[in-house]
């Protein structure tokens, strides 16, 4: 090291390690975001924290793998934020797509935790009736809207993550 400068071999090693870490983060991000988008679009319960509260369990037993599923949303969000902040500065569009994916995944988690789970808990607390009240119908409509928003955000985030991972660095 001369005059505070990093030598060329070390710079190549750091670049390779950063690309390797970025590739691993992109793999984890794509996997988690894809599972999350799939669970939102096609499943009965979204794989985000609170999903066990969305569908009641009649036997009272906790879901044995709920801990693993609860981690999918936060892992997708964490890797998206890490990629948006720490990814290489090669292509600006990639950083923009990583940022959009992170914002979308944050929206999915926020809509789930702050809207759909409280609505489900309120609906569960209501006594069974022959005809639904106006209030419960309003809650169901609000839940459907929030679910549509979080599904759209989840799928859009996955599309952004796929697009960001397919952008190649251009040779200078």
Regions found by a protein language model. Give the residues of each.
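Juxtamembrane transmembrane-helix termini
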Residues: 46-53, 86-90, 115-125, 164-171
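N-terminal amphipathic/basic-hydrophobic helices that include classical n-h-c signal peptides
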Residues: 1-15
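Interfacial loop at the N-terminal end of multi-pass membrane proteins
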Residues: 24-78, 122-140
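Glycine-rich, hydrophobic membrane-spanning regions of integral membrane proteins that mediate transport
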Residues: 11-20, 53-61, 89
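A generic hydrophobic-segment detector
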Residues: 124-172
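A periodicity- and composition-biased signal for non-globular, repetitive helical segments
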Residues: 8-11, 50, 156
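Acidic/histidine-rich alpha-helical segments that form the ligand environment
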Residues: 99-115, 119-128, 140, 144
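Hydrophobic alpha-helical topogenic segments used for membrane insertion/localization
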Residues: 21-44, 68-88, 94-114, 149-166
């Amino acid at each position: 090291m001369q005059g505070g400068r990093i030598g060329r071999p070390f710079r190549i090693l750091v670049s390779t390690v950063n690309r390797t870490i970025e590739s691993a983060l992109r793999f984890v991000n794509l996997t988690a975001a894809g599972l999350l988008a799939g669970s939102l679009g096609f499943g009965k319960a979204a794989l985000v924290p609170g999903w066990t509260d969305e569908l009641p369990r009649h036997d009272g037993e906790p879901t044995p793998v709920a801990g693993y599923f609860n981690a999918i949303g936060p892992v997708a969000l964490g890797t998206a934020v890490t990629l948006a902040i720490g990814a290489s500065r090669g292509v600006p569009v990639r950083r923009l797509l990583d940022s959009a994916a992170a914002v979308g995944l944050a929206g999915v988690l926020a809509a789930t935790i702050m809207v759909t789970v409280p609505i489900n808990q309120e609906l569960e607390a209501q006594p069974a009736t022959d005809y639904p009240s106006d209030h419960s119908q309003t809650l169901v409509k609000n839940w459907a809207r929030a679910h549509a928003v979080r599904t759209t955000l989840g799928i859009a985030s996955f599309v952004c993550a796929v697009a960001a991972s397919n952008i190649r660095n251009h040779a200078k």
